[in-house]
């Protein structure tokens, strides 16, 4: 039963790290990523639909993205959705595709985005600590119900702490890597 708690704890913490990395993909670094458009929804016949579901999004170079809609009549809707998303660029509609030209980031912008990355990392650490607390509560309940001894409980809590320390270390590494990518000119 303790092994089950350890496995659940590792799994949940790993999911928190994966969620952090997905969140990082929406941040702009030196090269513009197509993921920066992931949160944009287009009005597709009255239904809010993810941009990547109504057309292909590709990176032309480090500062340019191109959107090729499956249906040409969606160009205006895509253009409006991008403007409403307020991502800092104006869409350039050529009648066939929409191009987004991102200006090079200033040092100030880089620092702000790096600060956002750090805040995301802190949120992930809080999630990991909450998972640790839940695991420790399960261990204490087993001890209280006399299913494990006090010594086993202490060892189990130490093991949960080791798992937590590993997860926090991975989060710190992810944050450092993302900050380096953002601040790199």
Curated annotation (Swiss-Prot):
Gene3D superfamilies assigned to the protein according to its UniProt record, in alphabetical order: 3.30.1360.40, Ribosome-recycling factor
Pfam families, per database record: RRF
Alphabetized InterPro entries for the sequence: Ribosome_recyc_fac, Ribosome_recyc_fac_dom, RRF_sf
Region ranges (Disordered): 138-159
A single MF term (Gene Ontology): ribosomal large subunit binding
Alphabetized UniProt keyword annotations: Cytoplasm, Protein biosynthesis
Subcellular location as annotated: Cytoplasm
Disulphide bonds in the chain: none
GO biological process, one term: cytoplasmic translational termination
Major location (coarse): cytoplasm
CDD domains: RRF
Highest rank taxon of the organism: Bacteria
Function according to Swiss-Prot or TrEMBL: Responsible for the release of ribosomes from messenger RNA at the termination of protein biosynthesis. May increase the efficiency of translation by recycling ribosomes from one round of translation to another.
Family note: Belongs to the RRF family.
Protein name stated in the entry: Ribosome-recycling factor
């Amino acid at each position: 039963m303790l092994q089950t708690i350890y496995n659940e704890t590792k799994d949940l913490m790993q999911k928190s790290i994966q969620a952090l990395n997905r969140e990082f993909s929406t941040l702009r670094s030196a090269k513009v990523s197509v993921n920066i458009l992931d949160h944009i929804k287009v009005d597709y016949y009255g239904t809010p639909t993810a941009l990547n579901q109504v057309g292909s999004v590709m990176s032309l170079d480090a500062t340019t993205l191109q959107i090729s809609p499956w249906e040409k009549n969606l160009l205006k809707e895509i253009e409006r959705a991008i403007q409403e998303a307020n991502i800092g660029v104006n869409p350039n509609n050529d009648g066939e595709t929409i191009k987004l030209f991102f200006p090079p980031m200033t040092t100030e912008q880089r620092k702000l985005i790096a600060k956002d990355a750090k805040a995301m990392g802190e949120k992930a650490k809080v999630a990991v600590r909450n998972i640790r607390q839940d695991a420790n509560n399960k261990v204490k309940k087993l001890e209280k119900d006399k299913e494990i001894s006090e010594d086993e409980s202490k060892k189990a809590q130490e093991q949960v702490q080791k798992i937590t320390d590993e997860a926090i270390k991975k989060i710190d590494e992810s944050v450092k890597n993302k900050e380096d990518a953002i601040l790199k000119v």
